[in-house]
């Protein structure tokens, strides 16, 4: 059994933080989303595919800042491009800088549905404006949704502080289940503005699902049939599964789509992209503005990140790493005798525990992630992982063995 990590400074900083910030740290970074007392709460720095906490413990990081790190931490080419922009031109002005056009032309070149784009800062910004565009264009109100789309009022799972009327026109359907979507569309056929879906199913704390053959095509057809817009939320899949997103990978083109996270390797930028007919409502009918949306630091980072992704065929390398890693982990899981599932795409691996009526799976899950972090492998119990370009073959091989040893400890509890 691996030894417990020394986390004294992390814990001390957290106690101080709770007097300064509600909850100490924001949202999904709070200890209850990991294993309290076993995981660090504050990182100090990162490089490549590794991060170091404030107590000096180094980890192979498979959460990748919840997805933005597609290449690696502190990539010199990207950072240098941003620093050059800040030092020599500036990045925050009353008007827009010309690199906006450069980035949007590149997005239009790569993403099947992209004829126009609106640049924003976060995934939540992008999905929320997508809903506004769908409603503004169609003149309808209701939305069918699947997946996590951010923290804004219309879609957040935790409803505290949100009047029901702000989300009462949002209807949730099940992934890979056409009947659940059809029922919503038929019941609201005269007022359905749009369908928003993550093209890869990645619910929090549950198995990652790939679309069944014909599923996304059928969703596309239903959107046409019920005269509503199809929106792909590609915040996680974009610039990770392919340069054109899951829509390019699976050959199904939505009307609108959102991108972010890996788009700029960690810098704050996201985009709503789509067909000109629909996007044009943002020119006059639908309002979109923010002090920081035009800031060029994220735009420059995105331009440079995409340049590197294309030039070095980064996503092909990431997929190959993920396939090899996944095959080895799957074998370990099968041999472990522990009731777990290994799911996901090559770029999004995830081990989940099979639920049982007695709730033993919760204890098994806690023990597994306790052992894993003690092996200095950073994964999140309730969120799938990510592979990045800077994860080395040695990192991945070590992690396979760490998973093997962690599952062996879990097996002792059965």
Curated annotation (Swiss-Prot):
It is an enzyme of class 2 (transferase). Keywords: Aminotransferase, Pyridoxal phosphate, Transferase. InterPro entries: Aminotrans_3, Aminotrans_3_PPA_site, PyrdxlP-dep_Trfase, PyrdxlP-dep_Trfase_major, PyrdxlP-dep_Trfase_small. It catalyses: (3S)-3-aminobutanoyl-CoA + 2-oxoglutarate = acetoacetyl-CoA + L-glutamate. Pfam families: Aminotran_3 (PF00202). Its cofactor is pyridoxal 5'-phosphate. The modification N6-(pyridoxal phosphate)lysine is found at residue 261. Pathway: Amino-acid degradation; L-lysine degradation via acetate pathway. One of its GO terms (molecular function) is transaminase activity. Disulfide bonds: none annotated. One of its GO terms (biological process) is L-lysine catabolic process to acetate. Optimum pH is 8.0. The keyword Glycoprotein does not apply. Its EC number is 2.6.1.111. The keyword Isomerase does not apply. Homodimer. 3-aminobutyryl-CoA aminotransferase that acts specifically on coenzyme A (CoA) esters and catalyzes the conversion of 3-aminobutyryl-CoA into acetoacetyl-CoA in an alternative pathway of lysine fermentation. PANTHER family: GLUTAMATE-1-SEMIALDEHYDE 2,1-AMINOMUTASE, GLUTAMATE-1-SEMIALDEHYDE 2,1-AMINOMUTASE 1, CHLOROPLASTIC-RELATED. Belongs to the class-III pyridoxal-phosphate-dependent aminotransferase family. This is 3-aminobutyryl-CoA aminotransferase.
């Amino acid at each position: 059994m691996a030894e417990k990590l020394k986390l004294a400074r992390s814990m001390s900083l957290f106690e101080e933080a709770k007097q300064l910030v509600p909850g100490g740290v924001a949202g999904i970074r709070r200890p209850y989303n990991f294993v309290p007392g076993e995981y660090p709460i504050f990182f100090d720095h990162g490089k490549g595919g590794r991060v170091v906490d404030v107590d000096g413990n180094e980890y192979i990081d498979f959460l990748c800042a919840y997805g933005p790190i597609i290449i690696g931490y502190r990539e010199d080419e990207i950072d240098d491009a941003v620093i050059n922009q800040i030092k020599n031109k500036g990045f925050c002005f009353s008007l827009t800088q010309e690199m906006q056009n450069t980035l949007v032309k590149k997005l239009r070149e790569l993403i099947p549905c992209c004829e126009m784009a609106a640049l924003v800062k976060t995934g939540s910004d992008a999905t929320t404006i997508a809903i506004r565009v769908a409603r503004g264009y169609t003149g309808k109100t209701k939305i069918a949704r699947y997946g996590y789309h951010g923290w804004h009022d219309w879609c957040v799972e935790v409803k505290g502080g949100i009047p029901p009327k702000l989300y009462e026109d949002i209807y949730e359907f099940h992934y890979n289940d056409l009947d659940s979507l059809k029922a919503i569309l038929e019941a609201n056929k005269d007022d359905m503005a749009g369908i928003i879906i993550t093209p890869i199913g990645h619910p929090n704390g549950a198995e990652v699902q790939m679309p069944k053959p014909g599923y996304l095509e059928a969703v596309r057809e239903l959107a046409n049939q019920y005269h509503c817009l199809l929106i792909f939320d590609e915040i996680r899949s974009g610039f990770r599964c392919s340069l054109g997103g899951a829509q390019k990978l699976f050959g199904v083109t939505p009307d609108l789509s959102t991108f972010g996270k890996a788009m700029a390797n960690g810098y704050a930028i996201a985009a709503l992209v789509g067909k000109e007919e629909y996007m044009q409502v943002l020119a006059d009918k639908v309002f979109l503005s923010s002090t920081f949306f035009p800031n060029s630091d994220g735009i420059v980072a995105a331009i440079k990140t995409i340049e590197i992704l294309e030039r070095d065929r980064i996503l092909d390398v990431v997929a190959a790493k993920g396939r090899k890693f996944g095959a080895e982990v799957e074998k370990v899981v099968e041999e472990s005798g522990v009731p777990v599932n290994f799911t996901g795409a090559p770029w999004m691996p995830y081990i989940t525990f099979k639920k049982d009526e007695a709730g033993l799976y919760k204890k098994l899950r806690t023990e597994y992630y306790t052992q894993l972090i003690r092996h200095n492998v950073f994964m999140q119990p309730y969120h799938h992982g990510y592979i990045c370009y800077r994860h080395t073959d040695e990192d991945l091989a070590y992690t396979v063995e760490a998973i093997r040893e962690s599952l062996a400890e879990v097996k002792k509890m059965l």
